[in-house]
Amino acid sequence: MAKIIGIDLGTTNSCVAVMEGSTPKVIENAEGARTTPSIVAFTEDGERLVGQPAKRQSVTNPERTFFAVKRLIGRRYDDPTVEKDKHLVPYSIVRADNGDAWVEADGKKYSPSQISAFVLQKMKETAESFLGEKVEKAVITVPAYFNDAQRQATKDAGRIAGLEVLRIINEPTAAALAYGLDKKSAGTIAVYDLGGGTFDVSVLEIGDGVFEVKSTNGDTFLGGEDFDMRLVTYLADEFKKEQGIDLRNDKLALQRLKEAAEKAKIELSSATQTEINLPFITADATGPKHLTLKLTRAKFEALVDDLIQRTVEPCRLALKDAGLTAGQIDEVVLVGGMTRMPKVQEVVKQFFGKEPHKGVNPDEVVAIGAAVQAGVLQGDVKDVLLLDVTPLSLGIETLGGVFTRLIDRNTTIPTKKSQTFSTAEDGQTAVTIRVFQGEREMAADNKMLGQFDLMGIPPAPRGVPQVEVTFDIDANGIVQVSAKDKGTGKEQQIRIQASGGLNDADIEKMVKDAEAHAAEDKKRRALVEAKNHAEALVHSTEKAVAEHGDKVGAVEKGAIEAALADLKSTLEGDDVEAITAKTNTLAQASLKLGEAMYAAQQPGAEGAAKPADDVVDAEFTEVDDDKKKSA
């Protein structure tokens, strides 16, 4: 049975793990790293780079390098949070035909699901290379506070990458699974997850293999990227004060600032001061300009203090929803790279009144939890039951634009709930069901997930027809809504397709694009391998001709030199078959030279050392020490 893998699709980094028997294992990628940057880039000639290779060239190719795209997934272009990000990233965020936020490079638009799919493909290949078999099924994690549109978009990304997503699991829940798998004692834990782009806090009760989420809260636009951007803004402001040049208008400089900010942030977790040194960051009429600045940990903490404080309110709400006090939490588990920051740990300690647990790897624990859930689905992991919750209330718009809740936040999923509504006007023959997700009292202030019409209601006075609306949330947190006229039995149901989002045709096209890209990547790899093999042969043959060319006849030497010249000129092109054919020709032609070189090394060959006259051929037998003594 093919393995089901667990993938942590992160804002900054992604990670893949698999169960080996009853033990989860994080898989190293082709570069030998256990996490892969969630970065996708396109080179000038259209080659696609994913992970570390994409990150390495980001400074010289900022407009075609996409990072932190998870923050855009399932979001509308006119979302205020997208508006804020547009001016802080060097790549273009554009409006898609359906009103969603997409990204663009060289005139080609990509949906965030598509970019995420390229990262997922890399994780899939990493797992396949380790397992030695095809991988087609996965469990993928999402921030607990993701809404339906964001969950659906993540599932779409999996489909585009050629993966059947068996389960979407919340990141803090996955972390709790990994943390609690080998724990024997029962208890209540809080998972504080501050990652690259999102913040979640979940309260869980663990005991006897049951992981029950009591509540969850968070902010899907708060994470390490915001800390980086705060530092980028500070550096740009300081440079402008000193030099009068705004580096934010220069995409190349902006990318260098971003890289320096990330590096400084990481260094300040262990050091109390760091130096940011960016020579030749820009130039004006007076010549090149350099940015040099000392940054203390205290200054950095002051710059981002409000961001850290923003995590406190979700923690308070999560405890309130769970009906618990901070003192009733047995353990606080830190997840996400940003929890390495001493100030973050200090704030967590102050709020919960206890030292946070640092025994899990914050970068890998979510992928490990996803692998455990994959093991549960596969039947490899027994006696584990996961009870998650829906993060946001779900309901419909009723008369006067009021948001009427059908399912409250933190309801255990899967769940199903029905409620009966009626018409607002006399003789009304159709109703429009508008579905929303959120916590505000007016529907317009919440996130609209979609709408559909129930037609063919028999005309009747207002308030008489009875329309039963049913919400069904599956274990992935994805919503299905149906409406039924009780009088006629007519029913209309939809799996929520956000007013934006990708339809099946879009996804199918993107799947084909991804397959085409995979085919192109294979061709490129074949070309690189053919060229490497050819160049190695050219080098070794030239060396052999220089050292041993006199050992073959003029005809053979001429044939080798002709084949060499032929292969060298073919190497200037990109025809794999031609390069392979010419490589074989050269290999064949240089066989005679190899034979001559080998013959020259043999005893009796010309130039080989002759044995001395007094050397006698003899047979040797082993004699043990006792016989030696008696001899």
From Swiss-Prot:
<keyword id="KW-0143">Chaperone</keyword>
<dbReference type="InterPro" id="IPR012725">
    <property type="entry name" value="Chaperone_DnaK"/>
</dbReference>
<dbReference type="GO" id="GO:0005524">
    <property type="term" value="F:ATP binding"/>
</dbReference>
<feature type="region of interest" description="Disordered">
    <location>
        <begin position="601"/>
        <end position="631"/>
    </location>
</feature>
<keyword id="KW-0067">ATP-binding</keyword>
<keyword id="KW-0547">Nucleotide-binding</keyword>
<dbReference type="GO" id="GO:0140662">
    <property type="term" value="F:ATP-dependent protein folding chaperone"/>
</dbReference>
<feature type="compositionally biased region" description="Acidic residues">
    <location>
        <begin position="614"/>
        <end position="624"/>
    </location>
</feature>
<dbReference type="InterPro" id="IPR029047">
    <property type="entry name" value="HSP70_peptide-bd_sf"/>
</dbReference>
<dbReference type="GO" id="GO:0051082">
    <property type="term" value="F:unfolded protein binding"/>
</dbReference>
<comment type="function">
    <text>Acts as a chaperone.</text>
</comment>
<protein>
    <recommendedName>
        <fullName>Chaperone protein DnaK</fullName>
    </recommendedName>
</protein>
<dbReference type="InterPro" id="IPR043129">
    <property type="entry name" value="ATPase_NBD"/>
</dbReference>
<comment type="similarity">
    <text>Belongs to the heat shock protein 70 family.</text>
</comment>
<dbReference type="InterPro" id="IPR018181">
    <property type="entry name" value="Heat_shock_70_CS"/>
</dbReference>
<dbReference type="Pfam" id="PF00012">
    <property type="entry name" value="HSP70"/>
</dbReference>
<dbReference type="InterPro" id="IPR029048">
    <property type="entry name" value="HSP70_C_sf"/>
</dbReference>
<feature type="modified residue" description="Phosphothreonine; by autocatalysis">
    <location>
        <position position="198"/>
    </location>
</feature>
<keyword id="KW-0597">Phosphoprotein</keyword>
<keyword id="KW-0346">Stress response</keyword>
<dbReference type="InterPro" id="IPR013126">
    <property type="entry name" value="Hsp_70_fam"/>
</dbReference>
